[in-house]
UniProtKB/Swiss-Prot annotation:
Subcellular location: Cytoplasm
Residue sites binding Zn(2+) per the record: 98, 100, 125, 127
EC number(s) recorded for this UniProt protein: 6.1.1.17
Cofactors demanded by this protein: Zn(2+)
Record InterPro entries: aa-tRNA-synth_I_cd-bd, aa-tRNA-synth_I_codon-bd_sub2, aa-tRNA-synth_I_CS, aa_tRNA-synth_I_cd-bd_sf, Glu-tRNA-ligase_bac/mito, Glu/Gln-tRNA-synth, Glu/Gln-tRNA-synth_Ib_cat-dom, GluQ/Sye
PROSITE patterns per UniProt: AA_TRNA_LIGASE_I (PS00178)
Origin organism lineage: Bacteria, Pseudomonadati, Pseudomonadota, Gammaproteobacteria, Alteromonadales
GO biological process: glutamyl-tRNA aminoacylation
UniProt cofactor note: Binds 1 zinc ion per subunit.
Gene: gltX
Name listed for the protein in its UniProt record: Glutamate--tRNA ligase
């Protein structure tokens, strides 16, 4: 039997890290078993569902590279199918119309609460004969009486619910709209889902859904209910911990590989290995290896992984993601070095692509002023001679290469009998406007000959004015 999994978010908000991890685990279960992955949008909550949220979910999935084989399916486009099944259940007697008023239901719950009883529907309309009336009604599933529902969860082991603890679930509201728990069952059946991976908050839905599947004569899928993600302080994950949109991580400069690697390790492990490519995840992933204990979100670990991937992935690939940040920061990359070369030069220092973009601006744009602190420290009178001599050496070069630039800087220090820092730091501030950059040879090479010479001339003029003031 072909493994078939699904990710079924509700479009009431963005795709957050918890949802992204569930999607990843479900995707990996399909890919690890040569199966199929279905994307389904559960938009039956019409009042809260928005197209913007739906678009954000699709954008997040695409950015992460979690491609789907079927879908996206939308529940609101399947109402005819749900109503068809409800009609069949009413005819077979596995569902019934309930005419109880809201007032009666509220009074029942208040009475049960006062008596310390579980609050559930009492089956008042369960065995009433059919009646011809215009009274409003809901449709309820006729849950089995007695016995229990047992299933083996890949994460949590054997789970059992008594049927007596379950009430007769509403499967269609008074307006005729089918309910979430019912739509999920029909969808999983129709789409041939063999394994359901979802959050632990759905555990209580599972026995109800299994009972409906049994009533329909449908196969029961496997289940894996993953634990919640906590903040590093042990509290439920919130925005202050990192419970933000997946696309916010893109905006903050993270690579999708880093976020995927981080998310897969939030509850799953393979020995002591920390860094996993997608291919390795597909090779090693097993649902039974997911830990049922909650996982703590640690931003420092995510940053470490991001640094790793910026340094080790193909610079051409990293450059495709960096381009978004260059555009976002309004840096025109058409007049300057190839972005992949900038990635190679700056990757060792960069924590995020957002930082990398900001620190690469001087490769593409001239700066109005030198950093005041760095200029005060390094563009002093003693810097005039080194800057003038290195300018002459660079102007005399027949080729503008990293090796030739390096020799020109070294020769300047040798002829002046000073340390490299006496030449290097004034030169660095001259061409970058600041005090940090990669090696000066590669920095000048990437800035380009014309720009470098113009900036050194500007620095010499700055130092001369300072001497004369």
């Amino acid at each position: 039997m072909t493994t078939k999994t699904r990710f079924a978010p509700s479009p009431t908000g963005f795709l957050h890290v918890g949802g992204a991890r569930t999607a990843l685990y479900s995707w990996l279960q399909a890919r690890a078993n040569n199966g199929e992955f279905v994307l389904r949008i559960e938009d039956t909550d019409i009042e809260r569902s928005t197209q913007a949220a739906c678009d954000a979910i699709l954008e997040g999935m695409n950015w992460l590279g979690l491609t789907w084989d079927e879908g996206p399916y939308y529940q609101t486009k399947r109402f005819d199918r749900y109503n068809e099944i409800i009609a069949q259940m009413l005819e077979k007697g596995t569902a019934y119309k309930c005419y109880c008023s809201r007032e009666r239901i509220d009074a029942l719950r208040e009475s049960q609460a006062a008596n310390g009883e579980a609050q559930k529907y009492d089956g008042c309309c369960r065995d009433l004969p059919a009646r011809d009336t215009d009274e409003p009604f809901v449709v309820r599933f006729k849950n089995p009486i007695g016995g229990s529902v047992v299933f083996d969860d890949h994460v949590r082991g054997r789970i059992e619910f008594s049927n007596d603890a379950l009430d007769d679930l509403i499967i269609a509201r008074t307006d005729g709209v089918p309910t979430y728990n019912f739509c999920v069952v029909v969808d999983d059946w129709d789409m041939g889902i063999t394994c359901v991976v979802r959050g632990e908050d759905h555990i209580n839905n599972t026995p109800r859904q299994i009972n409906i599947l049994k009533a329909l004569g449908a196969p029961i899928p496997e289940y894996a209910h993953v634990s919640m993600i906590l903040g590093d302080d042990g509290a439920k994950l919130s925005k202050r911990h990192g419970a933000v949109s997946v696309m916010q991580y893109r905006d903050d400069g993270y690579l999708p590989e880093a976020l995927l690697n981080y998310l897969v390790r939030l509850g799953w492990s393979h020995g002591d290995q920390e860094v996993f490519s997608l291919e390795e995840m597909k090779q090693y992933f097993k649902l039974d290896d997911i830990n049922k204990a909650p996982s703590a979100f640690n931003t420092d670990k995510l940053v470490w992984l991001n640094q790793h991937y910026i340094k080790t992935l193909d610079p051409e690939y990293v450059a495709t993601h960096l381009q978004w940040h260059m555009d976002d920061q309004k840096i025109d990359t058409s007049n300057g070095p190839a972005l992949a070369e900038v990635v190679t030069a700056l990757a060792e220092r960069a924590k995020t692509l957002k930082e990398l973009a900001a620190s690469s601006r001087y490769f593409y744009e001239d700066f109005a002023d030198f950093d005041a602190e760095q200029a005060k420290k390094h563009l002093r009178g003693v810097a005039l001679e080194p800057l003038q001599l290195v300018q002459q050496k660079l102007a005399a070069l027949t080729e503008w290469t990293v090796e030739a630039i390096h020799q020109a800087i070294e020769q300047t220090a040798t002829e002046l009998d000073v340390g490299m820092g006496k030449v290097g730091m004034p030169l660095r501030v001259s061409v970058t406007g600041a005090g940090q950059s990669p090696g000066l040879d590669i920095t000048l090479f990437l800035i380009g000959r014309s720009r470098s010479e113009q900036r050194i001339s500007k620095a010499i003029e700055f130092v001369a004015d300072r001497i004369n003031s």
